[in-house]
């Protein structure tokens, strides 16, 4: 039975998370992984190239050596292991899952706020602070997006929760009540 990408990413990230947490190197590892992820984001298709059967093994190893040249042992071993198992195109998913584990451990929630007009930094900070209190977490990190179709108010979305305070939704609710 073949495992899906998410299952594999969760297994690899959990193992790495446990090791670096035990060794007190979680923050450094997280920063390092985010740099690696940026390289993959800036070079779209890099993971597929490193798993492509058409590319010579020595060419793949040259790219791999560049990626791991300044890497810590743990990150270097993770990259080499994903390469050895032909899963380099899973690396960004593994890093995402590692970041999710770090956020959960630190009680950080990442959310997207959608508003009809651009929000100032002060408004975002206040909104994040209030939402963190409501969720009983240490911090809410908001990513802001503008959508004028909501008319006014805001919608805050996390992975597991949607708080919809938009005028458009309120209008729809009133309409439904009037219709019966």
UniProtKB/Swiss-Prot annotation:
Domain of life assignment: Bacteria
Gene Ontology molecular function terms on file: proton-transporting ATP synthase activity, rotational mechanism
Keywords linked to the UniProt accession: ATP synthesis, Cell membrane, CF(1), Hydrogen ion transport, Ion transport, Membrane, Transport
TM regions (residue ranges): none
Cellular compartments annotated: Cell membrane
Any one Gene Ontology cellular component term annotated for this protein: proton-transporting ATP synthase complex
Topology class, membrane: Peripheral membrane protein
Entry protein name: ATP synthase subunit delta
Annotated organism of origin: Pediococcus pentosaceus (strain ATCC 25745 / CCUG 21536 / LMG 10740 / 183-1w)
């Amino acid at each position: 039975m073949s495992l899906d990408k998410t299952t594999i990413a969760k297994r690899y990230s959990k193992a790495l998370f446990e090791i670096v947490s035990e060794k007190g190197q979680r923050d450094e590892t997280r920063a390092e992984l985010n740099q690696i992820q940026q390289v993959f984001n800036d070079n779209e298709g890099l993971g597929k190239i490193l798993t492509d059967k058409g590319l010579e093994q020595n060419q793949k190893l040259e790219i791999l050596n560049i990626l791991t040249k300044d890497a810590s042992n743990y990150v270097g071993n993770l990259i080499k292991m994903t390469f050895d198992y032909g899963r380099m195109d899973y690396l960004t998913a593994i890093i995402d899952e590692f970041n999710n584990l770090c956020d959960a451990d630190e009680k950080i929630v990442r959310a997207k706020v959608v508003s009809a007009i651009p929000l100032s930094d002060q408004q975002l900070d206040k909104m994040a602070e209030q939402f963190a209190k409501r969720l009983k977490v240490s911090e809410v990190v908001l990513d802001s997006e503008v959508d004028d179709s909501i008319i006014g108010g805001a919608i805050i979305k996390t992975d597991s929760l949607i708080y919809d305070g938009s005028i458009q939704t309120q209008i729809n609710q009133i309409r439904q009540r009037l219709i019966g």
